[in-house]
């Protein structure tokens, strides 16, 4: 049973890569549905902003509470800003934003396309001489690739602001000390790595959710199974990709805090 599920999962991942190649091949001749693109951008961006901000704020509160008291105990409050800002810029903001979008938007994409596949609406598109990649897949991919970096940037800004507030109100750490250590340790490449990760995660969310919907079968039960499998696969792929990207981006950079202290 496990071998069968693993084989099926690998086949779907291969078909996702094929979908990626097919979309790239059609970019020059593609008929872009601007209204659908605008709708998807709103769904992924403004439609997901509230939950993204709430999650970022509360995660930042908890993370700051746990880190700040330990740093005060070690008499290392001057390094608090550097650690928190680096953690959110390099890892937490892009990953948490991607997880939220995977659960909210990825599941929606899969359920929508799977329902269309089950009710033969995909076949109807072919009869109308409309390629599903143009009409369904591209707007979703473009929306995720455009909005994930923007949402991650907003999430990062909110997380840092909340962290500064909690550090001052609960532990008496001045914002000047927090920001000084943060700016000394943070580099432009760290911010660009956040954007690059967000772009990769947006691509993963869009392609996997669309492909799992296009290959759905088995009626209403199949729609549910495809949606669940889609989200699980997206999350697993995001975590694996995050490790690979982090390894190549940061493994050889050395300590940012030590470099900041030397300035």
Curated annotation (Swiss-Prot):
Family as reported in the entry's similarity comment: Belongs to the MlaE permease family.
GO cellular component: a single term: chloroplast membrane
Membrane topology term: Multi-pass membrane protein
TM helices/strands, residue ranges: 43-63, 82-102, 136-156, 159-179, 199-219, 230-250
Domain of life: Eukaryota
The keyword Transport is annotated on this UniProt entry: yes
Keywords recorded for this protein, A-Z: Chloroplast, Membrane, Plastid, Transmembrane, Transmembrane helix, Transport
Function according to Swiss-Prot or TrEMBL: Could be part of an ABC transporter complex.
Gene Ontology MF term list: phospholipid transporter activity
Pfam family for this entry, one: MlaE
InterPro entries assigned to the protein according to its UniProt record, in alphabetical order: ABC_MlaE_roteobac, Permease_MalE
Protein name: Probable ABC transporter permease protein ycf63
Main location: plastid
Subcellular location: Plastid, Chloroplast membrane
